[in-house]
């Protein structure tokens, strides 16, 4: 099985609360699809107090009238996505994101959406940079995550 036949997936620790912290990851896209970029905020399993604190930072995830009630803690990041080619890299996305809707929850983390973008097959590099010092994230494990978007009928 070649690297291009594997689904794109990135999951790396990221110092989202430390200004200037940067993580970079290379990945391959096999099929033209929408890919989702997240910040995952982890909580300690079995610690209800810690889970509730992280939930407040992640926001409510509720959508009255199609809008989020509370996006939680603003986590300003700059996301750059480049397609890697024989003649170097070409920019696909270079944008600052501040407020992230809480989009989901797993057994050990809450997911805050950065963005979704269509990617064509090929090799890519994603780089995310923290733009502010955020004391509330000091003892929270945050991961930068990328995966194929669930089909929601939109872009």
Residue ranges and their predicted role:
Residues 1-155:
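Acidic, Ser/Thr/Pro
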């Amino acid at each position: 099985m070649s690297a291009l036949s594997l689904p794109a997936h990135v999951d790396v620790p990221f110092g989202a609360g430390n200004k200037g912290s940067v993580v970079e990851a290379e990945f391959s896209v096999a099929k033209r699809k929408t890919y989702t970029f997240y910040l995952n905020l982890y909580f300690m399993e079995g610690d209800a107090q810690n889970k509730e604190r992280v939930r407040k930072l992640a926001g409510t995830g509720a959508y009255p009238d199609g809008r989020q009630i509370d996006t939680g803690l603003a986590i300003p990041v700059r996301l750059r996505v480049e397609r890697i080619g024989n003649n170097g890299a070409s920019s696909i996305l270079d944008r600052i994101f501040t407020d992230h809707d809480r989009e989901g929850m797993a057994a050990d983390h809450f997911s805050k959406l950065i963005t979704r973008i269509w990617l064509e097959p090929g090799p890519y590099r994603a780089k995310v940079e923290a733009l502010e010092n955020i004391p509330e994230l000091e003892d929270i494990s945050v991961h930068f995550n990328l995966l194929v978007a669930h089909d929601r009928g939109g872009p």
